[in-house]
Amino acid sequence: MGEQTAEINGVRICYETIGDPEGRPLLLVMGLGGPMIWWDDELCELLAGRGFRVIRFDNRDCGRSQAMSGRAWLLGSFLRQPPPYTLADMADDAAVLLDHLGIRSAHVTGVSLGGMISQTLAIRHPERVRSLVSVMSTTGGRLVGWPNPRVLPFLLGKAPAGREAYIDAVLATFRQIGSPGFPFDENRMRTRAVRTYERGINRAGTLRQLVAITSAADRSAQLKKLRIPALVIHGKADPLVHVSGGRATARAIPGAELMLVPGMGHDMPRGVWPALIDGIDRTANRAVSSEQAS
């Protein structure tokens, strides 16, 4: 159908659907500063080939969705200053997007920040989430999921000026946080960086998203109340969200499956796709089996 925009939860959200409109709805939620195209086009088509109606979107403050306002101060979140918006607000965006599309409930997969949003969606709107796949994310617990200090300069450094500097910075960053056990596809990453730049770079928006993360409370107790099929996927070599975050998430959600991937960092290289696609499909099928049993 191509990209569309809608007023969602008082925010202009850009979204796209891929696959059979009558297919199983699958909402894909991307991470920090990542537009919907970070869900690779080919990956989305492969998921559509499994019978899913794939829905991807730019989170607020990212890509072609609305840039928000408000000053975000990272240290302020640790001093309990209220953020410009919260993970709950971002989760509500997703719920209202489903409303806009006429979808009562969906299978939901989120990556990194997207995993946190997806968890929050399941907590706040449990009737909207048929199954949950949380990828390279964490619970918000203060003792798990912390980044390796060596990658922080790549994330918190000075913003690159201009297109080529941005592309170079993206390549350098993903060489640091990416998957050492899988080939680094420079051409694919460069193409993605170009497309991301063309959608618009919102450095202030990324900081506001980051403050939404650091301001959030530990979700572990609320995750324990979930009663949906869940899969947690995490790379054993993730330097940005330590694998302890994935383990904690799987411990918190009753009956969750934990998939730890050797050599996977904080990205989704093509070599991980088969396991990811199978995992999403398998978890969705568990939801169908549970619904039929009840």
Please describe what each predicted stretch is.
Residues 237-241:
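Acidic catalytic loop of the alpha/beta-hydrolase fold
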Residues 123, 132-161:
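Flexible "cap/lid" loop of the alpha/beta hydrolase fold
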Residues 206-222:
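Active-site nucleophile elbow and catalytic-triad environment of alpha/beta-hydrolase enzymes
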Residues 88-106:
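Conserved acidic catalytic loop of the alpha/beta-hydrolase fold
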Residues 226, 232-234:
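Short beta-strand/loop motif that positions the catalytic acidic residue
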Residues 164-207:
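Conserved alpha/beta-hydrolase catalytic His-Asp/Glu region
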